[in-house]
Curated annotation (Swiss-Prot):
Name of the gene encoding the protein in the UniProt record: mnmA
Documented EC number(s): 2.8.1.13
Cysteine disulfide partners in this protein: C113-C210
Protein name as catalogued: tRNA-specific 2-thiouridylase MnmA
Organism: Bradyrhizobium sp. (strain ORS 278)
Interaction with tRNA (site feature) positions: H138, Q352
Similarity remark: Belongs to the MnmA/TRMU family.
Length: 397
């Protein structure tokens, strides 16, 4: 007989570590599991120390959040520990963030934080504490498959779904993780917080990059990678100089505003040339692509990745967290993979994630994903497309 976490044994005999950020979601996660009788231990990670951020609405992981997490733990009567991960976070997340921008990419630091810190280091700590699982307040769900493994699926609350940021979760990590809020909406979570009489019930959600207290990410990049803030030229597709810029880190693919140049028609950033420090701009149609190359592909679908894509795998992909999944197919082998977009996309930026799903909406299963290495120009992206025969089977939850 399995308990509510799909584990054998009584809740009171099952230790669960909850990653407590000090926000309402992780606090309700801890409260729910405690109310169900589990042996809950709360852990909060101190990831950085920015004085301005400690009391700033919209930031997360700062001093006030640690205080809030501790108060919730006391309210629930559970042990609570604060672990200093500042050095690890700086090396794995902040330094990589700055390096990515300096190389002309637009990174997603939350993905690396989940992969390296929360689901890497913290998961290891949870095991050392004798926990059977690590639970988080992410809006995503997992389902037990017939063979006992788990599938990662989208959350019930589509507006809050965080599956895009968790594509790099490995199968081994997924087996150990639980997401109790996956079947709830945000209003339901806040209502539970009030029922549990948690002080954070109406606390603002985190919105900013947690280690950028002012919201100006270029401050961090300029300090760690000053070369990314060196001035250069803004040119059109033919190399004609249109203006000047104060650092490629100020720009991202698809950007239109803030170019500071006069033109007869709207111009968009279509390329960042790190070698020449040039920002290349062009018309909107120059942003369109049908083919994306990927790196660091993670596969959590059924079977082995190369076997799944041998004849091309039809699926759905999301190339930004704010965009809906679009039909595509995946092909490649031996670590080299490409995604071909059926309808094409605009403004695909290197450094962002391309996440694989088995359906375009609903409780779709996450099949994995990779980081975007490059977007092939439209003129060469549509040649020789061969429709795949293998189709991903959706998981019904």
């Amino acid at each position: 007989m399995l308990n509510s976490l799909d584990l054998e044994g009584r809740p009171e005999d099952t230790r669960v570590v909850v990653a407590m950020s000090g926000g309402v979601d992780s606090s309700v996660t801890a409260a729910l599991l405690k109310s169900q009788g589990y042996d809950v231990v709360g852990i909060t990670l101190q990831l950085y120390d920015h004085g301005a951020a400690t009391h700033r609405k919209g930031a997360c992981c700062a001093g006030q959040d640690i205080h809030d997490a501790r108060n919730v733990a006391e309210r629930l009567g559970i042990p609570h520990y604060v672990l200093d991960y500042e050095d690890r976070f700086r090396e794995s997340v902040i330094d990589n963030f700055a390096a990515s921008y300096a190389s002309g990419e637009t990174p997603v630091p939350c993905i690396e934080c989940n992969r390296a810190i929360k689901f890497g280091d913290l998961l290891k700590t949870a095991r050392e504490l004798g926990a059977s699982v690590l639970a988080t307040g992410h809006y995503v769900a997992s389902r037990r498959l017939p063979d006992g493994s788990r599938a990662l699926t989208c959350a019930a609350d589509a507006d809050r779904d965080q599956s895009y940021f968790l594509f790099a979760t490995t199968r081994e990590q997924l087996d150990y993780l639980r997401f109790p809020l996956g079947d709830m909406t945000k209003p339901e979570v806040r209502e539970l917080a009030r029922r549990f009489e948690l002080e954070v019930a109406d606390k603002h959600d985190s919105q900013d990059i947690c280690f950028v207290p002012t919201g100006r990410y270029t401050d961090i990049i300029g300090k760690l990678r000053p070369n990314a803030m060196e001035p250069g030229e803004i040119v059109d597709l033919n190399g004609r100089v249109l203006g000047a810029h104060q650092g490629i880190a100020n720009y991202t693919i698809g950007q239109r505003k803030g170019l500071g140049i006069a033109a007869g028609a709207p111009l968009y950033v279509v390329k960042l040339d790190v070698t020449t420090r040039r920002v290349v701009v062009g018309p909107r149609e120059a942003l369109r692509t049908h083919r994306i190359t990927l790196r660091e592909v993670n596969w959590i679908g059924d079977g082995a990745l190369d076997a799944a894509v041998r004849d091309g795998l039809e699926l759905f992909v999301r190339v930004r967290s704010t965009r809906a999944p679009q039909p595509a197919w995946l092909r490649g082998a031996d670590g080299s993979y490409e995604v071909e977009l059926v309808g094409g996309e605009e403004g695909v930026s290197p450094g962002q994630a391309c996440v694989f799903y088995d359906a375009a909406s609903g409780r779709a299963r996450v099949l994995g994903g990779g980081f975007i290495q490059s977007a092939v120009a439209e003129s060469s992206a549509t040649a020789g497309l061969v429709r795949p025969q293998r189709v991903a089977e959706p998981v019904r939850g």
